[in-house]
């Protein structure tokens, strides 16, 4: 069965589509969304959990080396990795919040996949993290269906990373592909997330419309200018409908981080000075909340930073405030800080002022945040989001008739107002902010399922009709497969299957073969 799989920075979801009607499956406590969070007793427990309890293969040498190191570490530390050692979603968050020092916790693994400078062992670790989440989600989906899930269309941003370009995209998509294969998906395709979101919106249109899809996810913002309408709905080749697109690595997480830095970190000593009147360095406070930046988090939780923070406590005019930051370092509270800012951001969607409590750092430590403060705090990432809108429009010669705003941050009045100000004459439409990408991926998966029954072989096209219903298309080319065509007394030995990923186009499967008889 083919599913649409939104492996998101903030949340994950999956859907199936039947006769053009997508249905999202539940993943956690009856909810359609599984927050992109994972925890385990140790970092090494992830690899052992995959191997010991799910027999997930490690086909490459780096993955095998990671597994051997993990098994050795857990054995030496007397850590018993059980079937329930690895937790996901809100359960993972709850475990972390109860005892952050004793739990290895990661939020939004997807935000790291395109990072530059990752070493092979780091790539192998992220692959295991993604694989564990995908395996769990696949199992949750199969528990609601009467057949196995082995095929998926997975959403991807236009650009995973602000820097690195094609190389970063290739690295990130490679991690997703290998993780999905190891998690049991034998057949995997990718589709741009804003295109998928647009497919869901298209189902509501009754005439051809120029649509600017603005998808503000947890880790990225993607914009696509598309032609949409009834005449495009069932077309296999839609390359002509993609008029322009752009994307960058700025999303809801960046808004949360900036809000935490601007409104919460002053309670922890940001902006203070030493007893001699010298300004305290801001970098440790920034690194503490930069949870989507591997080098920043590594630097903050280093022994050298711990020594620096103790020195700052000693020298600061207000040592009690700086001691709060030292506690964040000691108890690994970065995610809780950013989570508090995220809760404030969400609350400010419906009210002008909200209160953020940092009682997990010190009793009575709290602050009020207003909508005006939110707008000021997120000004920098907001400008980058609007820049992507203008870049997408600059790549085409026409203007949109409607803006389709979606993604987890689409509900923010600040974002909506800024977008409306940038394009004052264009109406803004909304749909399912958290489910539109998944629903669109499921729609595309249903189309692919039909397309995969058509194969181009050396210029001859064999279509899946009553005469050729026995065609079995497999994408695994590790061994040579024998394919039988019912209406011809021929057997073909497949030498190679070649495909090309197209942003919004026809699935082309070209087979090199020799005739056996």
Whereabouts are the PLM-identified features?
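Nucleotide/phosphate-binding catalytic cleft detector across ATP-hydrolyzing
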Residues: 1-22, 96-213, 234, 321-340, ...
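A short acidic Gly-Thr/Ser loop motif
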Residues: 5-11, 157, 213-222, 226, ...
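Extended, hydrophobic alpha-helical segments in both membrane/secreted and soluble proteins
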Residues: 176, 209-224, 405-408, 415, ...
